[in-house]
Amino acid sequence: MAPVWPAARGRTGGLGTRGRVSPVEFRNKNVKRKTWRPNHLQAFAGSVREGQGFAFRRKLKIQQTYKKLLRREKKSQTPSESPFTDWYPDHLKHLYLAEEERLKKQLRKADQPLSEEQVDQPLPEDQGSSDQALSEERCSIEQPQPAEPCSIRINSINIPKKNKKKTSNQKAQEEYEQIQAKRAAKKQEFERRKQEREEAQRLYKKKKMEVFKILSKKTKKGQPNLNLQMEYLLKKIQENN
């Protein structure tokens, strides 16, 4: 009777695991394995305990924007009064304020056309007396002057002239016109020089062609005409002398 061989027990996994190769068998032993290091380079500065990473920077940004909004609200809540009224001296503040009101009224009257009846009417006594008092106190404070020029100043209504300043559009228009004028002058100068250069080149070529015709003439035998060449040279020497 033939001997029966037992089934191979050491085969890799039977039918289900046929063809699989474990990675341990074919691992290269010469290559060094990378060890895990806990202190690797971080993607941001600081740590969670220190609190100086991206979260801390985001917190600072939010605080800055909040403070900026508070400053804007304070600026918008401030009353829009004239900043110069607080700087007046205390003993002359009422005079400056009265003068401001008087100038405002004069400007309003100057803007509106007056009728004939309003022109003929004299100034009221209260206004004239207040104007006199203001002008007299000004004269006494600023410089001790006689009473006559002060009275003359009272009668004449001094309306400040409006400074006619040029707008940015007008300034830009003037600058553009100046630049255009400069460009036109440069273009004319360039055209003039170009014409002069072309004229000089034309005369030079004409003269060279005449000389070439004289020197290129030949005799009946086809030889260069030396007599004409000598005459040309003598003529040139005489012109130089």
From Swiss-Prot:
- Lineage, top-rank taxon, reads Eukaryota
Q: Which Pfam families match?
A: rRNA_processing
- The keyword Transmembrane helix is annotated on this UniProt entry: no
The principal location of this protein is nucleus
Where are the residues of the annotated region Disordered? 1-21, 107-201
Kindly list the GO CC terms recorded for this protein: nucleus
Question: InterPro entries annotated for this entry?
Answer: Fyv7/TAP26
Bias (Basic and acidic residues) ranges: 186-201
Biased composition annotated in UniProt, kind: Low complexity: 151-160
> What keywords does the record list, in alphabetical order?
Nucleus, Transcription, Transcription regulation
Q: State the coiled-coil residue ranges.
A: none
Q: Does the keyword Transcription regulation apply?
A: yes
Subcellular localization(s) per the UniProt record: Nucleus
Which family, according to UniProt? Belongs to the TAP26 family.
As for what it does, the entry says: Component of the transcription complexes of the pulmonary surfactant-associated protein-B (SFTPB) and -C (SFTPC). Enhances homeobox protein Nkx-2.1-activated SFTPB and SFTPC promoter activities.
> Assembly and partners?
Interacts with NKX2-1.
Please report the name of this protein according to its UniProt entry: Thyroid transcription factor 1-associated protein 26
Upper lineage is:
Eukaryota, Metazoa, Chordata, Craniata, Vertebrata
